[in-house]
Design a protein with these regions (language model features):
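Contiguous transmembrane helix-bundle modules in multi-pass membrane proteins
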Residues: 1-128, 133, 215-257
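Short beta-strand-plus-loop segments that form exposed binding edges in beta-rich domains
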Residues: 211-213
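Soluble non-transmembrane domains of integral membrane proteins
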Residues: 118-208
Length: 257
């Protein structure tokens, strides 16, 4: 139930930039045509780019198109010509951009995330989507109040190494408990992380591997919404108001002698 309602809400939000208080202003054709075309093109390419992660999701495609349509509509309709850049208008822009970016991140994580479990050892790489994980070695560590074993994994995309992950399995002697410290490689367009499991041999370990595309965009969208709300609460005082034209003062009449 939530997904259809969210898609309907996103579709309605794409029309917000065309609304004006108490009326619907006529928009130029370019402002009506360009946003949906950009959303369809970029959203389609974004969805097709994740084909190697699984089957193409039509719900994910529609959500991508609507999110990018909203972004294009907001940016195209936001101008400084009439009222200057006020905190009120900038707050509205940031809040709605935050909704679109957050929705885009949630959609990618929901439909295109990948995870897998395996026993990884030297000479036996593991493929997860477009990424290949290779075991490089292990080393013992002594921390302030724990001992640990750290595993080094190299991550390749094609022939290029894109990251190195170093998950740890820690033992706290005071609490007599073991804890796992995941290895994380974060990026703007996706996060890779590995959780270390039990040791299965001299150079073999059970592991859970994850790929979360655009997961950071969820937090980015939330921060933009918070910033937009704070600006809206700060008032309507213009930040970059256009300067009024100076009107020359009339010459004073000379007083009669």
């Amino acid at each position: 139930v939530f997904v259809p309602l969210a898609l309907v809400l996103m579709a309605l939000m794409t029309q917000i930039p065309r609304l004006r208080w108490q009326c619907l202003a006529a928009s130029p054709p370019i402002k009506r045509i360009v946003p949906p075309l950009l959303g369809l093109l970029v959203g389609g390419l974004l969805s097709l780019g994740y084909r190697d992660l699984g089957a193409l999701s039509w719900v994910g495609l529609v959500a991508n198109v609507l999110s990018l349509w909203l972004v294009a509509s907001l940016l195209l309709n936001f101008s400084f010509k009439t009222h200057g850049l006020s905190a009120n208008r900038l707050g509205s822009l940031l809040a709605h951009l935050g909704v679109a970016i957050c929705a885009l991140g949630i959609n990618q994580v929901s439909h295109y995330s990948q995870e897998g479990g395996t026993v990884l050892k030297a000479g036996s790489p593991y493929q997860l989507g477009a990424y290949t994980f290779r075991y490089e070695g292990n080393e013992p560590l002594i921390g302030p109040n724990y001992t640990a074993e750290r595993i080094t994994l190299s991550v390749h995309k094609g022939a290029k190494e894109v990251a190195r992950l170093m998950p740890e399995r820690r033992h706290y002697s005071v609490r007599t408990m073991n804890m796992n410290e995941p290895g994380i490689a974060w990026g703007l367009f996706g996060d890779l992380y590995v959780v270390l499991g039990e040791k299965m041999g001299p150079d073999a370990y059970a592991m859970r591997l994850h790929y979360k595309p655009l997961v950071r965009w969820i937090w980015l969208g939330g921060m933009l919404m918070m910033a937009g709300g704070a600006l809206r609460l700060s008032g309507r005082k213009p930040l970059l108001a256009s300067r009024p034209a100076k009107i020359p003062r009339p010459l004073r009449e000379q007083e009669a002698p």
